[in-house]
């Protein structure tokens, strides 16, 4: 019954392997980034995030987070360079967060957890569509951005203001004209490694690009994330208090760092 996965005691990350055996695979995400063990690689380039023409469409509560969806029918918002070969189109972004401000990020840095983590999901245009790309080892590229508790984030507030209208699973709301680059800091220094989606189906098709510099979020803004529901309307209320997967074994992988 694969559609019953979640983040609870009986269906959470430690149970996923039963329906999705790849959960114990060789390139699972997230991981802890040990800054003393990362490898500088002169072949890495600066990231090119070309989001000027980005066309956000709508916001959807999918029962495990909420997605802000983009028009990916053309090269409107793309990611290039960095560790990547080719062009990757932005299809959606979403967040992972915790039940308190001291946890919630999926990646950790020297075991340190942040309050939340933004994932900007892109697919390799050489594969024609997201579904096909998600099955390929170089099919997806996800940019991870840590949210660190501090000042309120005005760009993020535009997103949070819509959450009341998508409180329960299956609800969606129009969300045009949002610029995803407003959520990013200017400095795009990063760590990168080969990994996976961090929730089922956990496909091992992701080149991870984790930005070193966190963006800010206030404690008050964090409360808004936790006001969403995992459940659909009319079902018993289950607050979306936490939706993060813990760090997975690095196994035979290297985390590379830019700049060196």
From Swiss-Prot:
Residues that, per the record, bind Zn(2+): 94, 96, 119
Sites bearing N-acetylserine, chain numbering: 2
Catalytic reaction equation(s): hydrogencarbonate + H(+) = CO2 + H2O; urea = cyanamide + H2O
Keyword Cytoplasm tagged: yes
GO molecular function: carbonate dehydratase activity; cyanamide hydratase activity; zinc ion binding
Family named by the database record: Belongs to the alpha-carbonic anhydrase family.
Protein name: Carbonic anhydrase 2
Organism: Ovis aries (Sheep)
Phylogenetic lineage: Eukaryota, Metazoa, Chordata, Craniata, Vertebrata
